Regions:
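Bacterial Sec-dependent N-terminal signal peptides
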Residues: 1-30
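Sequence/structural signature of beta-propeller domains
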Residues: 20-297
Length: 297
């Protein structure tokens, strides 16, 4: 009997690890609470070179409030605030994009299109500001909440989005960006209107977005009726980017089936890492939380 104990244990481990993946609790219940402070609600998130750590930004507007922080899922205290590197603080940071090919370097963008190229030192937990630039023709009436840097071979592109509302569609823009020039410029190539079917009220069609390994664009659509909710979020595959002869184009999905639904949270931050999607919330007065989907579960 003893000689069969080890194979049985291994079999049970494999069964529990893989055979029961679909028996996980609904994703809407699998939140890890970050904070109940309004100041720490999360509006953008990106991975770092340490797989349990994520850089996040906050949409704060007042002096003395944090703009950026680090989530460490392996630590006892999940969140640590970081100092912004300059006295002049950004206003209303809404999204954070990692820069492909550059470890721990990111673009943080505010709702008026002001962008900040920053670098994170994970040894000291310090942020350096490398450069600033602005999205062309940004500012009111646009309210930008999504930004991406895309890299294909030696060509670098940018995509950004106006969130939209009940009365207007979101607008997804894309073009090329001269990221390594002394003065960074973005050349708009095209744009498209995005209108998702749900949520139904206080709608933000695109509150954040990221691209997966198949060039599919994922986006969060939220219901944001006020600082105390109630909130709802749906995650959609909006469409896909194509790259040909150094040109970038976007193909809108024919329909928008919901990929994930969060009945009580406002997901304003998401990042796609291979087979994993990380969601984080800006639940206003209700604080912030983080959630992870692996292989669609």
């Amino acid at each position: 009997m003893k000689r069969h104990t080890r194979p049985l244990i291994i079999y049970l481990f494999v069964l529990l690890s893989f055979g029961c993946q679909k028996e996980l609790p609904p994703i809407d219940t699998r939140w890890q609470h970050i904070s109940n402070k309004r100041e720490l609600s999360i509006s953008g998130i990106s991975p770092t070179t340490e797989k349990e750590k994520y850089l996040v930004v906050h949409d704060n507007k007042k002096k003395g409030q944090l703009r950026i922080g680090l989530i460490d899922l392996s630590a006892d205290s999940l969140y640590a605030g970081l100092s912004w590197p300059t006295e002049n603080l950004p206003i209303d940071l809404e999204t954070l994009s990692d820069i492909p090919g550059l470890d721990n370097e990111y673009i943080a963008m505010g709702s008026w299109g002001f962008c900040y190229w920053i670098k994170l030192d994970l040894q000291s937990n310090k942020i350096d500001l490398i450069k600033e630039f602005r999205i062309p023709d940004s500012g009111p009436p646009l309210n930008l909440e999504s930004f991406l840097i895309l890299r294909r071979n030696k060509k670098i592109y940018a995509a950004w989005a106006h969130r939209g509302s009940d009365s207007e569609e979101a607008i997804l823009f894309w073009g090329s960006i001269s990221l390594f020039d002394e003065d960074i410029t973005i050349s708009l190539e095209d744009s498209v209107l995005i209108n998702v079917p749900w949520p139904l009220v206080a709608k933000r069609h695109m509150s954040d977005m990221d691209i997966d390994n198949n060039n599919i664009l994922w986006a969060s659509a939220t219901s944001d009726p006020g600082d105390n909710g109630p909130y709802e979020t749906a995650i959609y595959k909006i469409g896909s980017f194509t790259f040909k002869n150094e040109n970038i184009n976007f193909n809108v999905a024919e329909s928008f089936p919901k990929q994930f639904v969060f009945a009580n949270n406002k997901v304003e931050a998401l990042t796609v890492i291979n087979n994993k999607i990380v969601f984080a919330t800006d639940d206003e007065n209700l604080g912030a939380a983080i959630n992870i989907s692996i292989d669609g579960y």
